[in-house]
């Protein structure tokens, strides 16, 4: 297998991913703002009622379906987590997490950036009904963070952008582990055994080099159902499925055919407009090049725009809407303070301190081209929690403790906004200072 070719192709995927995520972050922000406006307007009752509307189909007295809110949080977000899983697998095999030397610094940073916010929140809410929300400020929203850092353009070193992306990927992996370990209740082992059986079949398909995505996706639906029924959040099934999707390029004669088509195209006469023959050759090249993509690349290319421009903005619109009126109790335990301090203070301090200590003890080394001041700036941007923080708040606060969920959402919005503004201004002024010195 030509690993160099695969690595180059996956590098191109990363560039496309950055582009879609950065613009997707802006769209995500607009939907969050729209949700807050609608939730505090004259149509707020219709807004909140909409998400409880059941969608599905009925067979006799048996209804198969969910509320619209559950369709978004359990089904559509599973596709988002599938893309995250594909991204993590790609980085582990070919990217910045593919070796200890590459991975150690951002992974250690992600660990510090999760532990510190979690401890701050837990310390403030210990021995209260809200202490279970410690996972809320531990997450980083890669779309928002990338959106901010891309707006800064050339003022930010490329190495810092790569560091932030890799940190966010490692952070996503950590958030998935937190969800699986701490936000799982009433496990049903019969369904877990069923899920394990599906995973074994998926592993067998991978082992047999099955490159068609259809059997993986069909079994993925079955895996989602088993995991959903087991008591573990169904989005974990999507991550497991992602790790079963093959990364190997299909072995056939299409690469030889591509060379022949390229040679034919080069031999055709140069025209201002493409001839019919040239158009047919280019069409054939496109088809054969697409066929040479690995299943992982195909699925990631398909999911990236859907996730960035539909699923995440819809999730934001459905979950960011909080009615800020006299009835909301902002003093529910210390949820507001715990989340805001966790995101705005815990994230940058945790990331900076653990990496600084790690380098001093020669456990890891800082990437070339970025200073400790840059690391601190990236830490502030990592405090933009939003999507994953909102998702965890939905899992942490249910039933009688829904007041805490509303407060947590306000805190996530405020904390993410403060972190984004501080991070952007800090990196902007840091670049300006460096320019003046020159």
Curated annotation (Swiss-Prot):
GO terms for molecular function: sodium:proton antiporter activity. One of its GO terms (biological process) is regulation of pH. It holds the Pfam family Na_H_antiport_1. Gene3D superfamilies: Na+/H+ antiporter like domain (1.20.1530.10). InterPro entries: Na/H_antiporter_dom_sf (IPR023171), NhaA (IPR004670). It catalyses: Na(+)(in) + 2 H(+)(out) = Na(+)(out) + 2 H(+)(in). It is a multi-pass membrane protein. Keywords: Antiport, Cell inner membrane, Cell membrane, Ion transport, Membrane, Sodium, Sodium transport, Transmembrane, Transmembrane helix, Transport. It is found in: Cell inner membrane. Its main location: membrane. The chain crosses the membrane at residues 23-43, 62-82, 104-124, 133-153, 162-182, 185-205, 212-232, 302-322, 337-357, 372-392, 410-430. One of its GO terms (cellular component) is plasma membrane. It comes from the Bacteria. The keyword Transmembrane helix applies. HAMAP family: NhaA (MF_01844). Na(+)/H(+) antiporter that extrudes sodium in exchange for external protons. Belongs to the NhaA Na(+)/H(+) (TC 2.A.33) antiporter family. This is Na(+)/H(+) antiporter NhaA.
């Amino acid at each position: 297998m030509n690993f160099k070719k695969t690595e180059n192709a996956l590098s191109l995927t990363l560039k496309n991913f950055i582009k879609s995520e950065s613009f997707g972050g802006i769209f995500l922000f607009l939907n969050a703002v729209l949700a807050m406006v609608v939730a505090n307007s004259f149509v707020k009752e219709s807004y909140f009622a909409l998400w409880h509307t059941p969608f599905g189909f009925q067979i006799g007295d048996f209804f198969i379906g969910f509320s619209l809110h559950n369709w978004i949080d359990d089904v559509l977000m599973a596709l988002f987590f599938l893309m995250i899983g594909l991204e993590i697998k790609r980085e582990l095999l070919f990217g910045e997490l593919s070796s200890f030397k590459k991975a150690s610094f951002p992974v250690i940073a992600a660990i510090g950036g999760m532990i510190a916010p979690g401890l701050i929140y837990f310390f403030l809410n210990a021995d209260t009904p809200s202490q279970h929300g410690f996972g809320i400020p531990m997450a980083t929203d890669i779309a928002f963070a990338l959106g901010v850092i891309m707006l800064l353009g050339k003022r930010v070193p490329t190495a810092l952008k790569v560091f932030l992306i890799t940190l966010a990927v490692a952070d996503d992996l950590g958030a998935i582990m937190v969800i699986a370990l701490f936000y799982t209740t009433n496990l049903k082992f019969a369904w877990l055994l069923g899920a394990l059986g599906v995973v074994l079949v998926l592993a067998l398909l991978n082992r047999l080099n099955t490159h068609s995505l259809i059997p993986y996706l069909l079994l993925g639906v079955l895996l989602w159902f088993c995991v959903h029924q087991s008591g573990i959040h169904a989005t974990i099934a999507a991550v497991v499925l992602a790790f079963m999707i093959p990364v190997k390029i299909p072995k056939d004669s299409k690469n030889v055919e591509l060379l022949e088509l390229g040679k034919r195209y080069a031999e055709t006469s140069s025209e201002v407009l493409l001839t019919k023959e040239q158009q047919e050759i280019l069409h054939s090249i496109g088809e054969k090049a697409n066929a040479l993509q690995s299943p992982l690349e195909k699925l990631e290319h398909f999911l990236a725009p859907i996730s960035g421009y539909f699923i995440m903005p819809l999730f934001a619109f459905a979950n960011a809407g909080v009615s800020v009126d006299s009835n909301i109790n902002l003093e529910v335990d210390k949820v507001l303070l715990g989340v805001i301090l966790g995101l705005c203070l815990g994230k940058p301090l945790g990331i900076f301190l653990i990496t600084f200590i790690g380098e001093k003890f020669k456990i890891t080394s800082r990437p070339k081209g970025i200073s400790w001041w840059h690391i601190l700036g990236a830490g502030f941007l990592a405090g933009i929690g939003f999507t994953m923080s909102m998702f965890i708040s939905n899992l942490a606060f249910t039933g009688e403790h829904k007041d805490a969920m509303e407060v947590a959402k306000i805190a996530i919005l405020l904390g993410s906004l403060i972190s984004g503004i501080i991070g952007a201004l800090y990196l902007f002024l840091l670049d300006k200072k460096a320019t003046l010195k020159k």
